[in-house]
Amino acid sequence: PTFDSAELATATAVAKGLPASPGAACGEIVFSADDAAEAAALGKKVVLVREETSPEDLAGMVAAQGILTARGGMTSHAAVVARGMGKCCVAGCSEVTVHESAKKMVVNGKEYHEGDVISINGTDGSVYDVAIKTVSPELSGDFGTIMKWADDVRNLGVRANADNPRDARQALEFGAEGIGLCRTEHMFFEDERIPKIRRMILADSESERREALAGLLPYQKGDFKGLYEVMGERPVTIRLLDPPLHEFLPKTEADINQLSEQFGISKEAIEKKTVELHEFNPMLGHRGCRLAVTYPEIAEMQTEAILTAALEVAKEKGYKIKPEIMVPLVGNVKELRFVKNTIDETAKKCFEKAGMELEYMVGTMIEIPRAALTADEIAEEAEFFSFGTNDLTQMGFGFSRDDTGNIIKEYINDGILERDPFQSLDQKGIGKLVKMACESGKETRPNIKLGVCGEHGGDPDTIEFMYKTGLQYVSCSPFRVPIARLAAAQATIKNRK
């Protein structure tokens, strides 16, 4: 939705953040995901206000009309998830100070409490302390005509980032040709699953971890079956578990007490494990393929879920499904080889048990600069590269994607940067890494599949660059798919020889 233009004209913004996800929202302020879900269940419209969001806030983000965060950039958790849901989000609003425990926020000296009404504009980052009427957009038949023209012209595939059947259906409605990124971690945060993943993390032995993972297997398999049933024979790329494990552990005293009672584990043991898993820089720590190396049983469970789901849907529906399993955060070919061996061994067991086989692909995200620089070696094991340009930009620039919103704003104002590199790919620097990886990857494996799944996949300038670099597809949030289709057509026309 957008704001009613007449009402918007009379309103004055009290703060301005980053326009992280377009649209408009108006509602009562809530400061926790649980409060957002409870209020929405009572029919209230709410805006979720957080210092910053994490995967455990997902239910509240779904329930809210919009999201406002005091910290975070254009590729922060709040921004990426909100864009994926087509939900309004203003991120990195430094004028807002959040006091979650007191259920209030302070904006330039003025206090706002839970239940006060605000309006936020994700298109320009404005925050208002009054209610502004929202208007739902309408699509005319002309939209379909233009999209058909674009599809007739373009030579670049367009996929969507989708984590569940609902998002997958939305993606298909917008014309996506497959799923370029399914983030499996989002599936773990539902109420009946989070205790099981926490039990696995708190386990003291491999056998205990395997027991906890066995409880998660049916849920993961069901999730993947749902995706395959919606997508049919279209490609689906599923990323193995990526975030550090500490993100799944309880943060509040109440949650720690509940977990302690549920599993008969002392509060001290839970707190000790939380301290053990604490990292000073978790985004460069124990995450991605490093989890699959140290805890191969996690990759085994996820591989079994992916392949068993595909086998069952192929048998039930008669579809020819070719799963694409993506290993995240690879920086060394030996890491990928280790995890790929785990995947292949698990696949053999799955096929023997099912009495049937199917083809599958194993590839990796190119998101660490070293992976781009050694892409010739990594292509020995990877059947596809998908460029994770959010992290590649973060590591290439040395910019934290969650903490540099204000710095980037200053740099743009001072003429140091032309655009936010997290919104539009830096073609001179990060683009060089992408180009180098494509060229050296093709030297090793001429038929390697190349795509991009970072948020840059919905940016027109980046799409043209990726087309010229020789990628086969881009992937973006479902609501950005029409823009990507149009931009792909424009890139094809502009670069005709």
Q: What function would you assign to each model-found segment?
A:
Residues 1-36, 40-46, 50-182, 186-200:
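Acidic, glycine-rich flexible loop/linker segments
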